Amino acid sequence: MHAFRNLLALLLLTLCAALPLSAQDEGEDLGSTEGALFLLLPVGAKAVSLGRAMTPLDGPESAFWNPAGLVAVRESQVVLLRGDPLAGTSTAFSVLWAHPGLGTLGVSYQLLDIGSQAITDIDGNELGSLSVRDHLGVVSAAAQLLESVRLGVNLKIVQFRRSCRGICPDAGTTATTYAFDAGLQILPSERLRIGAMLAHVGPRYQVLNADQADPLPARARLAVAYNLISLLTDDEELGGWLSVEVQDRLLNPGSLSLYLGTELTAGVAEAIFLRAGYVLGDLDQEDGARVGLGFRYERFDLSIAKSLAVSTLTGETEPVHVTFSIRF
C-alpha cells in the first residue's frame, strides 16, 4: 500500500515540476493557438452520453478523464472504445489491473485517424498517399488515500504523425511531447461526489520548429455529482446521478464550458444504464444534447452513445460511440 502511494506521490511531484515551465511558456503568448486539440475530443460512450461531465464519476473510461475514478474499478479488465468524431476515426483501448486495498494501474492507447490523401502528378497519376494520425499513450495510477478521498494521475505521450507512402513532396512530419493529468475525488457521503482535476499539462507542442510550437490545451475542471434517487428510496440497486461540471483554460481563463450529465441505473452485478447529457458553451464541441445506453451482464459491459448536436460544418450529427469491456 505504501509503495503504491509513494508511486503516486512521485508522479505528482513530477507534474508539479512541469507546471512552472508550462506556465511560463504559455504565458508568453496567451493568444497563441493551442496544439494537440484532439486531446479535447471525448473518448468513450459513457463520457459522450453524459456530456463530458465525468470528473466526479468513476469507471474504466476514467483512464481518459479523471484518473481518480479508476479507484472504483474492482476487477481487472480490458476496455475497447470506438467513435467517429468530426476530426476522424477514434480507436482506443485500456488494460486495467485492479488491486483491492491498493488501487488501480492502467495502460491505454488511442489512435485518431484523420485520413489519407492521394498524391498525384499533373496528369492525374497516383504517386503515393499522405496520411495524418494522432497517437496518445497513457499510463494511469489511482489509489484511495483516505476513506473518502481518491487520487489519480496520468502520464501521457502525445504524438502527431504525417507519413507518406510512395513518392511525396516531403518525407513526412513527426511531433512528440508529454503531458500529465492529476485528479481528485472527494466522497463526503454515499450520495455526494466532488471532483477536480488538471488535464493536459505539459510543454509546448512543436510540429515544425520551436518558434511555431503551440501550448497544449491545458484545462482545469471542477464538478459535483449527486444521487437524486437516494432521496426517494434506499434501494441500493437503483441510482439516479446528476453531474454538473465546469471547465476552463488553465492558464488563460475566461472561456467557461458547462457540462451536464444524468445517469439512471437499475441493478448492480447485472445492470442497465440510461444516460443523457448536455454541452453548453464548449469552444471545442458543438452545443447540444447527448444520449446513451449501458448494459452489464456477467463479465461484460457495453455502452452506446449518440450525440444529437448538429455540426455547423457538416450539418450532420456524429455516428454512434461504443465502449465494450471484459473483466478477468
What are these model-predicted stretches?
Residues 52-54, 76-86:
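Short strand-turn segments of transmembrane beta-barrel domains in outer membranes
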Residues 24-48, 57, 75-77, 90-328:
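Outer-membrane beta-barrel porins/channels
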Residues 19-23:
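Sec/Tat signal peptide C-region and signal peptidase I cleavage site
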Residues 1-8:
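Bacterial N-terminal signal peptides that target proteins for export
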Residues 9-18:
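Bacterial N-terminal signal peptides
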Residues 61-72:
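N-terminal periplasmic accessory domains that precede
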